[in-house]
Amino acid sequence: MEKEIKDHKSVGIVEKQFFTCAQVPSPLILENGAKLGPITIAYETYGNLSARKDNAILINHAFSGDSHVAGHYATDGPKEKPGWWDFLVGPGKGIDTDKYFIICSNILGSCNGTTGPASKNSETGEAYALDFPMVTIGDMVATQKLLIDHLGIPKLLAVIGGSVGGMQTLEWAIRYPEMMHSVIPIATTMRHSALAIAFNEIARQAIMTDPHWNRGKYYGQAHPDTGLAVARMVGHVTYLSDEAMRRKFGRNLQEKENLSYGFDADFQVESYLRYQGNKFVHRFDANSLLYITKASDYFDIVERISTSGPETELTAPQQKYLVISYSSDWLYPTYQARDLVKALKRSGRNVSFSEIESDCGHDAFLIPDDRLEQLMRGFLAGIYTGIAEI
C-alpha cells in the first residue's frame, strides 16, 4: 500500500484529530436560541502552516461527506479508497499541500466524529437522538470558526466547498468576511429550491415511516436501515444526470437476458441504486440525515446578500470569489450559480465564474477533472501571490 500511495502523489498516511469546545459554562448558542455543548469536532489537516500563517485553506465537505479529504488511514486495506478529494488535494495537485495548509472538519450534526444525534448526551449518558437541537448551516460554520481559532489561524487564504459544503463556504463569507482572502463555492446555491426541499422531504419520510425509526430512539437496537437506504437511493438520483444515467445504464438488464416479470432488479440502474442504498447504511446515521437535510432546506442567504451595500459585511475589498457550476447539475443548476454571481457583483464583490461542461450531474465536482484542477491551481496561486506582496 505504501508504494501505491507514493506513486499516487498522495498526502500519504493521515490521522483524524479531535477538538472539544463549547464546554460548560460556555456552550454554543445556536441560531434557534438553543444551547449545545460540549461539542467534539473531528478534523484532518494536510501540509504545513507557514510561519506567517497565511497559507491555510478550509475545505467544507458535502452532505454525507466527512473530514477525510485526502490520503489513507494507517488501518486502510490495500483496496480502500483514499479521501474523497484525493485527486485534487495533495503534493503538486490543484490544491497543493506542498504550498498550502489544508483543514477539513466533519460538520455539526453529522456522524463521522463530530457531535451529532448519535453522540452521547453528557446530561443523560445516552445518545441524543431527537433531543439533539436543530442546527443550521450557520451553526455548522460557527463551530468551524471555533476550530480555526483553536488552530491559531488569524485569516484563511481560502474557504472552499461543494454542494452543502458550498453553502457553508458562502455562510463563512457572510459571517466572517474578515477571516478569508478568497471564497470558492462549487455546485451550490444561495437557497434551497422547492425541488431540492421536495427531494429532501421524500428522504426524510422514507426514514421516519420505517417501523424501526422509533422517533429517533433506535440506538442499541434495530436501525431504520430500509428507510435510510431508500433515502439514499432518492438522493443519489439527484446527484446524477439524465445524460450520465443513459450513458452508464440505459435500459441494460442486470445479469440476465430476459425480463423477470416480477419485482427483482431487472435493470442495471435498479441494481445500482439498491447497492448504493445498502452501502450507505453501513457508514451513515439516519438521524444525521434528517438534521442535515433540514439544515440545507433552511439555508437562505438571498436577503442577506441582496441587502449588502458598500458599508456592509460582504464588501471587504480584498475578498475574491471563484464561483463554479456544472452544466448538467439539475439539483443546483447553473442559473442558480449565475444568480449568486449577480448578487455578489451587485454588492461590489470581485467575482470570477466558470461553468464546467460535464454530463456527470451534481456530483461532477467529486470526479477527477483537469479543468477543475486547473481552475483551483490558477486562482489560488493568484491569491497567494497577491497576499505575499502585501
Swiss-Prot record:
Protein localization: Cytoplasm
Pfam families: Abhydrolase_1 (PF00561)
Record has Coiled coil as a keyword: no
Pathway note: Amino-acid biosynthesis; L-methionine biosynthesis via de novo pathway; O-acetyl-L-homoserine from L-homoserine: step 1/1
Active site positions, chain numbering: 163, 329, 362
Signal peptide positions (record): none
NCBIfam families: homoserO_Ac_trn, PRK00175.1
Function as written in the Swiss-Prot or TrEMBL entry: Transfers an acetyl group from acetyl-CoA to L-homoserine, forming acetyl-L-homoserine.
Database matches in PANTHER family: HOMOSERINE O-ACETYLTRANSFERASE
Designated name of the protein: Homoserine O-acetyltransferase
Organism from which the protein derives: Desulfotalea psychrophila (strain LSv54 / DSM 12343)
Lineage: Bacteria, Pseudomonadati, Thermodesulfobacteriota, Desulfobulbia, Desulfobulbales
